[in-house]
Regions:
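Extracellular glycan-interaction surfaces
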Residues: 56
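Catalytic-core segments of class I nucleotidyltransferases/pyrophosphorylases
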Residues: 24-29, 34-35, 39-47, 59-62, ...
Length: 159
């Protein structure tokens, strides 16, 4: 799907609407992180709670915004807590296609209004993942992941 260079994350996600129409749910992830998340367990969790969206919650180094949770209910977001106390958006989602209705167009950022509306509307749950998760936002992180792959010790390679 050609989303165009200037399209924000929400607009990119909205472009898959025709492909997921009629489905009960679909999976979405960002392209800048790797994990050994059990996708089947995440889908099962999503189906069990009956909400529109599930986000994976992970504990990273303390350089990301954090999810505020009451149990598994996402109630808000905290920008970059110190240390690694908070759970963050791990970037792996299970979504009901109706989530796409919350996206206005190409200038919508998925992480802003759509996710906030899902959280405040009690339609977002967090699946806590305690295994391997690593972003690739810096050269250092890219090198770390490439070294893991080259060594044969890539925890995300589950096939």
């Amino acid at each position: 799907i050609d989303t165009g260079e200037g399209t924000l994350t929400g607009g990119r996600l909205k472009r898959v609407a025709d492909y997921v129409e009629g489905e009960d749910e679909f999976c979405m992830t960002y392209g800048d992180g790797l994990s050994d998340i059990d996708i089947s367990a995440t889908i099962t969790f999503h189906r069990e709670h009956g909400r529109l969206a599930t986000v994976t919650a992970v504990k990273p180094p303390g350089r990301f915004g954090a999810l505020e949770l009451e149990g598994q209910r996402v109630t808000g977001f905290v920008e970059k807590p110190t240390g690694d106390e908070g759970l963050i958006n791990g970037g792996f989602f299970v979504l009901d296609p109706h989530c796409l209705d919350l996206i206005d167009g190409d200038d919508t950022t998925w992480e802003d209004e759509p996710l906030t509306r899902l959280a405040t509307g009690d339609q977002l749950r967090a699946y806590e993942h305690h295994g391997f998760w690593q972003p690739m936002d810096t050269v250092r992180e890219r090198n770390l992941l490439e070294d893991l792959w080259a060594s044969g010790g890539a925890p995300w390679k589950t096939w």
